[in-house]
């Protein structure tokens, strides 16, 4: 392995015209990875006035330029002439109207990579010109009306959350698109014009909120889902209290009060070993066995053929056993403090964690020791704790853990910095007349990946890469680790574009299959803690001995660039939501709630892992260096909480919008009833004069209680009226749509196309899905290059469907394959049915 310890994007130059969160954050990610970034603000400074700008603009040189003047435009164009990448996040067409035309720029400089990050897609005729703030995109995209089963049962619709999820997904997706374009440019010399709409990124990120499986068997429906169906069919009001709601939760997937009065989130459903370990450390396993706790040997046969009533490791459990186990677990958790249980679960390899606030998370020993939180010494805030990098490289991350504060420079200094970097760059790509014409191929055509991952985050990383042409072999064990809900139902999203093989790699023959696969691929990826690497033969020395050129990517739960006390703890999305403060903010510390449905952090962790893999591919193509890339759910939660995940001496209190009663950030950024429904107004004090000029809002500037004023006035007219009036005044406002509404109006039967031409929303219906069910899911459409191809990926195939094909491709004979199948070293399925009934 090349020991040269240089960040992979050293020499790459970026002009960052981004505002708000998403655009500047993409440039921040590139800067963290070594790129030289010049950030350009308008004369008044950043449009988002927030301490988090110190995070977004770290490792950057910043200056103000007035693009509305000829002198300012000339300066901007000169900076662009000296960079590889240009980033902007305005409404579609704004940069062109100011005199910066990305398409025209690439006609003279085809090597240039441009990234546009509008709130809504440029081909979305309805929404493209809206003032698309974070909350407006969220409201329009169904985020505030589909916030999980809890909120449905409590009758809370709409709900509000201050998490900038649209931007958080767009950061990983857009940074990945830049990395993909850089990788392609090393081969062809060509850049690309790329668009990543925040709304489309949000829809992909929250894909588990929107996918539908028709005629889903009852065994997969939770007690909450069944109660929702019951109330809807019998016209019963959704009015379940928080306390009542707890009794609809599975015992292995809920919050418990501990001896210190604080709460602990247990998340070990669907995995037989995790649930059993939990019951044993709680001291109630033997008691439950004595009371007749049933056991089902094979969960992948139809439920009508089970040899027992249920089994631990089944999610959801039937109510009878759920109630019995929950009562015993409640009493057991009261015997120790939440911190004590955190250590017991973590050291015992059981998923679970104490609920904590974001302030506690940012200042925790583990986050600071592991590099998940870093310290930046700046002039404005002094020593500021900030999120660490979202991707890093094993044994090479120290340079990423000491970010430099934002540096304010003159135009001349910024230009000189870019030119000095250009002078020493070692160019290895085609240039000038050698730049190749656009091929129309995928960025990852020919790249082969061995996917050893499970659940959501890991599999999502490679599913994401399949749209760009990557060839993915998904390798799973012959005996499944998870029940069919997590092990199969979730894979309808994460298994797309892959061939599936089942092999027991812990046997001698299976190990040989694994080694042949490693020799045949470019990347190996797994989600697992570091302690599992050597036993699995995935440590650096073992993998290099098999294939010295193979890249490696690992995702985990609590991992950071350095080792911390929780580095080897296992867990899921929900655990990091609980431990990092997301749940305490969403529901309040005393009544925490899961945020949205599934995959809120998982999916973004997958996107971040893909970013890391593509950066590794780029670095290898450019320098020949082979590396091991990392990310974690903990790193990703910090990006999702950029407005909150920081601290410094004198910081304002952590008192952001929180709880079920929160309907906005403040009176001018808030949900209000109209006489026909709801609207979300997202304004601020600087727009009071414009608000006062709107018919019906005259006098708001003099109001002593703006919230009450707006409640009184907005309810007098329809939502349509207010949307028209606010749009005319260029004030951000939107009607909250539901996911069902968006699906109904933006779905089509799968047509082998990607919905990049369909605006901000696109879903495909698969009536002939391999599962035998009709599936509707969001398109892989958020990344929209002008030249590279995005392909419509194949639906998830049945597990083991390609086992024989994969073994044949590795050179095994028919008799070899039959022998492995007979010995159960390999298998062609986990059960008769794809999704067991």
Curated annotation (Swiss-Prot):
Q: Which InterPro entries match?
A: CoA-transferase_III, CoA-Trfase_fam_III, CoA-Trfase_III_dom3_sf, CoA-Trfase_III_dom_1_sf
One Pfam family for this entry, by name? CoA_transf_3
Q: Which UniProt keywords apply?
A: Lyase, Transferase
Name the residues annotated as catalytic in the UniProt entry. 602 (nucleophile)
Q: Which Gene3D superfamilies match?
A: Crotonobetainyl-coa:carnitine coa-transferase, domain 1 (3.40.50.10540), formyl-coa transferase, domain 3 (3.30.1540.10)
* UniProt keyword Transferase present: yes
Instruction: Give the E.C. number(s).
Output: 2.-.-.-
Q: What does this protein do?
A: Dimethyl sulfide (DMS)-producing enzyme. Acts both as a transferase and a lyase: uses acetyl-coenzyme A (acetyl-coA) and dimethylsulfoniopropionate (DMSP) as substrates to produce DMS, acetate and 3-hydroxypropionate-CoA (3HP-CoA). Mediates the CoA-transferase prior to lyase activity. DMS is the principal form by which sulfur is transported from oceans to the atmosphere and is a key component of the ocean sulfur cycle.
Quote additional remarks. At least 10 million metric tons of volatile dimethyl sulfide (DMS) are released into the atmosphere annually by the dimethylsulfoniopropionate lyase in oceans. It is a component of the tangy aroma of the seaside and functions as a chemical attractant that guides various marine animals, such as sea birds, invertebrates, and some mammals, toward potential food supplies. DMS oxidation products act as condensation nuclei, causing water molecules to coalesce, with possible effects on local climate through enhanced cloud formation.
- Record's family? Belongs to the CoA-transferase III family.
Protein name in UniProt: CoA-transferase/lyase DddD
Q: Which organism is it from?
A: Marinomonas sp. (strain MWYL1)
In the record, what lineage is assigned to the organism producing the protein? Bacteria, Pseudomonadati, Pseudomonadota, Gammaproteobacteria, Oceanospirillales
Gene this chain is encoded by: dddD
């Amino acid at each position: 392995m090349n020991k040269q310890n240089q960040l992979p994007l050293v020499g790459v130059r970026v002009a960052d015209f981004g505002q708000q969160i998403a655009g500047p954050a993409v440039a921040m990610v590139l800067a963290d990875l070594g790129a030289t970034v010049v950030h350009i603000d308008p004369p008044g400074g950043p449009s988002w006035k927030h301490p988090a700008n110190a995070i977004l603009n770290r490792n950057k040189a910043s200056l103000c330029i007035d693009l509305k003047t000829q002198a300012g435009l000339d300066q901007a164009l000169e900076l662009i002439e000296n960079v590889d990448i240009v980033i902007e996040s305005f409404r579609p067409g704004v940069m062109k109207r100011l005199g910066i035309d990305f398409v025209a720029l690439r006609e003279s400089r085809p090597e240039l990579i441009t990234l546009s990050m509008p709130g809504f897609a440029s081909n979305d005729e309805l929404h493209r010109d809206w003032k698309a703030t974070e909350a407006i995109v969220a409201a329009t995209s169904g985020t505030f009306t589909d916030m999980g089963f809890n909120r449905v049962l409590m009758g809370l619709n709409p709900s509000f959350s201050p998490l900038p999820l649209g931007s958080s997904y767009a950061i990983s997706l857009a940074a990945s698109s830049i990395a993909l374009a850089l990788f392609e440019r090393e081969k062809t010399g060509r850049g690309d014009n790329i668009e990543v709409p925040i709304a489309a990124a949000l829809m992909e990120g929250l894909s588990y909120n929107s996918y539908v499986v028709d005629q889903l068997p009852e065994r997969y429906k939770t007690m909450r889902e069944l109660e929702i169906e019951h109330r809807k069919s019998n016209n019963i009001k959704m009015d379940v209290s928080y306390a009542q709601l707890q009794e609809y939760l599975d015992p292995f997937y809920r919050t418990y009060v501990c001896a210190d009065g604080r709460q602990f989130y247990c998340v070990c459903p669907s995995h037989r070993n995790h649930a059993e370990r939990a019951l044993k450390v709680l001291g109630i396993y033997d008691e439950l066995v004595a009371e007749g706790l049933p056991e089902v040997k094979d969960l992948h046969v139809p439920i009508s053929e089970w040899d027992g009533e249920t089994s631990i490791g089944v999610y959801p459990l039937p109510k009878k056993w759920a109630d019995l186990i929950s009562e015993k677990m409640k009493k057991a958790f009261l015997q120790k403090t939440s911190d004590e249980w955190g250590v017991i679960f973590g050291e015992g390899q059981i998923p679970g964690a104490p609920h904590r606030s974001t302030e506690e998370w940012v200042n925790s020993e583990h986050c600071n020791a592991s590099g998940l939180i870093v310290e930046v010494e700046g002039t404005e805030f002094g020593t500021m704790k900030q999120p660490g990098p979202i991707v890093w490289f094993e044994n090479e991350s120290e340079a990423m853990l000491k970010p430099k504060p934002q540096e304010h420079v003159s135009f001349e200094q910024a230009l000189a910095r870019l030119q000095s970097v250009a002078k020493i760059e070692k160019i290895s790509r085609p240039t000038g007349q050698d730049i190749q014409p656009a091929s129309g191929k995928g960025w990852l055509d020919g790249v082969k990946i061995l996917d050893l991952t499970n659940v959501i985050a890991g599999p999502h990383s490679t599913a994401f890469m399949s749209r760009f042409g990557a060839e993915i072999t998904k390798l799973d064990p012959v005996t499944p680790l998870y029940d069919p809900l997590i092990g199969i139902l979730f894979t309808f999203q994460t298994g797309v574009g892959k061939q599936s093989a089942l092999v027991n790699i812990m046997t001698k023959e299976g190990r040989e299959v694994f080694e042949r696969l490693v020799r045949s691929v470019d990347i190996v990826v797994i989600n697992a803690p570091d302690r599992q690497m050597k036993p699995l033969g995935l440590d650096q020395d073992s993998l290099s001995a098999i294939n010295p050129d193979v890249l490696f990517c690992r995702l985990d739960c609590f991992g950071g660039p350095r080792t911390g006390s929780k580095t080897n703890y296992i867990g899921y999305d929900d655990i990091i939501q609980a431990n990092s403060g997301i749940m305490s903010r969403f529901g309040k510390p005393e009544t925490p709630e899961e945020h949205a449905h599934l995959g809120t952090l998982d999916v973004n962790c997958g996107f971040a892992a893909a970013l890391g893999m593509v950066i590794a591919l780029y670095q290898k193509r450019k320098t020949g260096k082979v590396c091991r890339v990392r990310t974690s759910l903990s790193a990703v939660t910090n990006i999702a909480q950029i407005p909150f995940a920081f601290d410094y001496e004198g910081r304002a209190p952590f008192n952001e919008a929180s709880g079920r009663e929160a309907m906005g950030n403040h009176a001018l950024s808030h949900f209000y009833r109209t006489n026909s429904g709801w609207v979300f107004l997202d304004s601020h004090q600087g727009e009071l004069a414009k608000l006062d000029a709107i018919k019906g809002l005259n006098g708001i500037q003099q109001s002593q209680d703006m919230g009450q004023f707006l409640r009184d006035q907005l309810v007098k007219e329809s939502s349509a009226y207010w949307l028209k009036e606010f749009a005319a005044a260029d004030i951000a406002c939107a009607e909250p749509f539901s996911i069902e509404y968006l699906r109904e109006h933006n779905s089509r039967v799968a047509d082998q196309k990607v919905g990049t031409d369909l605006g901000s929303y696109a879903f495909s219906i698969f009536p002939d899905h391999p599962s035998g069910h009709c599936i509707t899911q969001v398109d892989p459409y958020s990344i929209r290059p002008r030249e590279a191809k995005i392909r419509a990926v194949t639906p998830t195939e049945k597990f083991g469907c390609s086992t024989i094909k994969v073994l044949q491709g590795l050179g095994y004979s028919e008799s070899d394959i039959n022998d492995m199948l007979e010995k159960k070293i390999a298998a062609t399925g986990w059960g008769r049915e794809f999704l067991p009934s």
